[in-house]
Amino acid sequence: MSNGKIVQIIGAVVDVEFPRDAMPKVMEALKMQAPELTFEVQQQLGDGVVRTIAMGSTDGLRRGMDVLSTGNPIMVPVGQKTLGRIMNVLGDPVDEAGPIGAETTMPIHRKAPAYADQAATVEILETGIKVIDLIMPIAKGGKVGLFGGAGVGKTVTLMELIRNIAVQHSGFSVFAGVGERTREGNDFYHEMKEGGVLDKVALVYGQMNEPPGNRLRVALTGLTMAEYFRDEGRDVLLFVDNIYRYTLAGTEVSALLGRMPSAVGYQPTLADEMGRLQERITSTKTGSITSFQAVYVPADDLTDPSPATTFAHLDATLVLSRQVAELGIYPAVDPLDSTSRILDPQVVGEEHYTVARKVQGTLQKYKELRDIIAILGMDELSPEDKLAVSRARKLQRFLSQPFFVAEVFTGAPGKYVTLKDTIAGFKAIVEGEYDHLPEQAFYMVGGIEEAVEKAKTIQ
């Protein structure tokens, strides 16, 4: 513990001078009492001066103020006391519900698990959501990118995943809001409360209006909380919304530190920063962290360095489509655009793989025929094409599902469908066992038996 003095302030970057024999290390946290503020050391400039990034507003700071080195990186509370709470990048509560009271704290900078400690087998994480389990199965410890515009159901899908993991796998979730709109963070908190899943999730926010230091480190704060739960032997979900803003905060910090920008003005350390975060999100022999990352694609350009770097780390992509949402099919997942690395017969088994590919093939055929139907009508199609269209429309509707967290809005009770039932249901439709049932029977049901029951009421 040594004392230093502020010698220069440029925006969020603050230079602090320490005695030469007591210079703090890079990534160490420094604190000051009045105003209460934390800094993180980014560079050692020599002559006892370190360059730091402030984890808060630097308004009102002046040269000569005292700063204390803590000897540790930023330490955040971990454990079950964090559940149901909203915290900031430092792990301080911002929900006005008293102190966190956690017994344990952990540093936000840690090494990724060693190769020997990582889980060698691929295990499927059953989500109970038909379209996800069938078309883009998720591996325990996998990373899923969630692509979608405004209002297509990203938040509701995230909430349902949190709920299903909590109820079916007794797992916990951590939600890191990186560069979030404050309004969205507030809405998300209240929706979780209404959906009854708040006590199973820890929320860490670094909002849009906060300095870049907060937004850059808040993902690591959330990840550290998730790692603690994983090391207790649990299956944890980590939600990052939005991973693009993590990159953007890194760009701001990099520019403030005077580094030379690289392609499109991004920081030269883009791949390294992303890798350091992503490599820690993995399964070990004790537990798993499965992450869902909302990905904003600037100007819809998938070759932009930020989304391109993110893609390299993802195991699955979940694309929410406005066209699907307009048909009233929720979750509005595009089954032809969404992919998973583990949709492979050697991982999921021959039956699952074949059924998923047949479903996609039928839907693709319908997509190709749609223009002909729009111009000439159904009557001009060959009998085989008519059958393919009829099955595709049933499949399309069967991919919809009532959610538990949406019960309060829709009045329809939520459904959890096991992977076995999902495969059996889609297999039967593709093979024509239910060609005689009306397509409305397949809309917003759980398993295939429900569709059969619903058909009786329609006829």
From Swiss-Prot:
- Record function comment: Produces ATP from ADP in the presence of a proton gradient across the membrane. The catalytic sites are hosted primarily by the beta subunits.
- Which residues bind ATP per the record? 148-155
Q: Name one Pfam family in it.
A: ATP-synt_ab
Where are the bilayer-spanning segments?
A: none
Keyword annotations: ATP synthesis, ATP-binding, Cell inner membrane, Cell membrane, CF(1), Hydrogen ion transport, Ion transport, Membrane, Nucleotide-binding, Translocase, Transport
Kindly state the subunit structure of this protein.
F-type ATPases have 2 components, CF(1) - the catalytic core - and CF(0) - the membrane proton channel. CF(1) has five subunits: alpha(3), beta(3), gamma(1), delta(1), epsilon(1). CF(0) has three main subunits: a(1), b(2) and c(9-12). The alpha and beta chains form an alternating ring which encloses part of the gamma chain. CF(1) is attached to CF(0) by a central stalk formed by the gamma and epsilon chains, while a peripheral stalk is formed by the delta and b chains.
Q: Which Gene3D superfamilies match?
A: 2.40.10.170, Bovine Mitochondrial F1-atpase, Atp Synthase Beta Chain, Chain D, domain 3 (1.10.1140.10), P-loop containing nucleotide triphosphate hydrolases (3.40.50.300)
Q: What is the name listed in the Swiss-Prot or TrEMBL entry for this protein?
A: ATP synthase subunit beta
Q: Which organism is it from?
A: Thiobacillus denitrificans (strain ATCC 25259 / T1)
Q: Name the catalysed reactions.
A: ATP + H2O + 4 H(+)(in) = ADP + phosphate + 5 H(+)(out)
Q: Where in the cell is it found?
A: Cell inner membrane
Against InterPro entries, the record matches this protein to: AAA+_ATPase, ATP-synt_VA_C, ATP_synth_F1_bsu, ATPase_a/bsu_AS, ATPase_alpha/beta_chains, ATPase_F1/V1/A1_a/bsu_N, ATPase_F1/V1/A1_a/bsu_N_sf, ATPase_F1/V1/A1_a/bsu_nucl-bd
> What family name appears in the similarity comment?
Belongs to the ATPase alpha/beta chains family.
